[in-house]
Every structure is written in C-alpha cells, then in structure tokens.
C-alpha cells in the first residue's frame, strides 16, 4: 500500500475514524477474523457516502488485500476510505456539480434565475422562505446580474462543502 495514503489516514479526525469504525463494525459482526468480506465492502462505502463503481471497488480491494484472503481489515479499510475521499474531492465532484447545475437550470439557458432556484429548493420539501431563497440567490450571484452562471454556481457550491 502507498505510504502517502497511510500518512493521510493519520490526518483523519477522531470523528471521521469513529464514523468509519462504526460502519465497519456493523458489517464485521459475526466475522471471526474481524475483517469484512469484499462483497460487503461496497455496502459499507455507500453507507458512508462514497459511491465507487464496481471496477473502482475491485481495484481498491486488489490494492489492499495483499494476502488475497478476500477480506479487508479496519486498517486496510481506512486506507481505502482516504483514497476514496481524495478521489471524490476532484473530478467526480466537478461532474456531479455540473449535473446539479443542469437540474437547477430548467430552461437550459446556462443560468439559474430566481424562479428556477425557488422551484428546485421548494421541490426538496424543506421549509424555505422567500427571504431565504433571495439570500441564497444574492450569495450565489457574484456579478449581481440577477442570475447564477456555472462559474458562480461552482464557487458557491465549493463554499458549501
């Protein structure tokens, strides 16, 4: 395994480690060796908000399952989660943000106007006031043209993460 990922594990907060441990423990119940099978690994990672493709999952497993046992212990799991978090913070998230922008941009004109923002936020089912919506629009609309373009949207969403 790469030392860079092992070093990154050391940078995880106790809260992150505890969250990962809790998820890992759910799936390790009943396992005599304290390891989870590679079949269960995808479920654990999805539970933690990661969404690796089957190919990515198999690649990660192959990299950490050095003895070919088909199981992953907690230390190996932490290294995998760090890797997944790193991958999620680039590339994929840009694609996801692009998809999200297109969802908001109902008329596909390349901008999110106040009505589109209002429609999407109300569709979430959350209680949100007109003032809240206007405040969000003001925060996102950096050039004050009354609409949010893609670059403004990216900048706004990066501040949210």
Curated annotation (Swiss-Prot):
Q: Which GO terms describe its cellular component?
A: cardiac Troponin complex; sarcomere
Q: Which UniProt keywords apply?
A: Acetylation, Calcium, Metal-binding, Muscle protein, Phosphoprotein, Repeat
**What Gene3D superfamilies does its record include?**
EF-hand
Encoding gene, per UniProt annotation = Tnnc1
Q: Which family does it belong to?
A: Belongs to the troponin C family.
Give the species this sequence originates from. Answer: Mus musculus
**Sequence positions bearing N-acetylmethionine:** 1
Q: Which SUPFAM superfamilies match?
A: EF-hand
GO process annotations (BP): cardiac muscle contraction; diaphragm contraction; muscle filament sliding; regulation of ATP-dependent activity; regulation of muscle filament sliding speed; response to metal ion; transition between fast and slow fiber; ventricular cardiac muscle tissue morphogenesis
Q: Which residues bind Ca(2+) 1?
A: 65, 67, 69, 71, 76
**Pfam families attached to this UniProt entry:** EF-hand_7, EF-hand_8
Q: Does the keyword Acetylation apply?
A: yes
Entries under InterPro entries matching the protein: CALM/Myosin/TropC-like, EF-hand-dom_pair, EF_Hand_1_Ca_BS, EF_hand_dom
- In Swiss-Prot or TrEMBL terms, this protein is called Troponin C, slow skeletal and cardiac muscles
> What are the recorded GO MF terms, alphabetically?
actin filament binding; calcium ion binding; calcium-dependent protein binding; protein homodimerization activity; troponin I binding; troponin T binding
**EF-hand domain boundaries:** 16-51, 52-87, 92-127, 128-161
Function in brief = Troponin is the central regulatory protein of striated muscle contraction. Tn consists of three components: Tn-I which is the inhibitor of actomyosin ATPase, Tn-T which contains the binding site for tropomyosin and Tn-C. The binding of calcium to Tn-C abolishes the inhibitory action of Tn on actin filaments.
PANTHER family, from UniProt? MYOSIN LIGHT CHAIN 1, 3, TROPONIN C1, SLOW SKELETAL AND CARDIAC TYPE
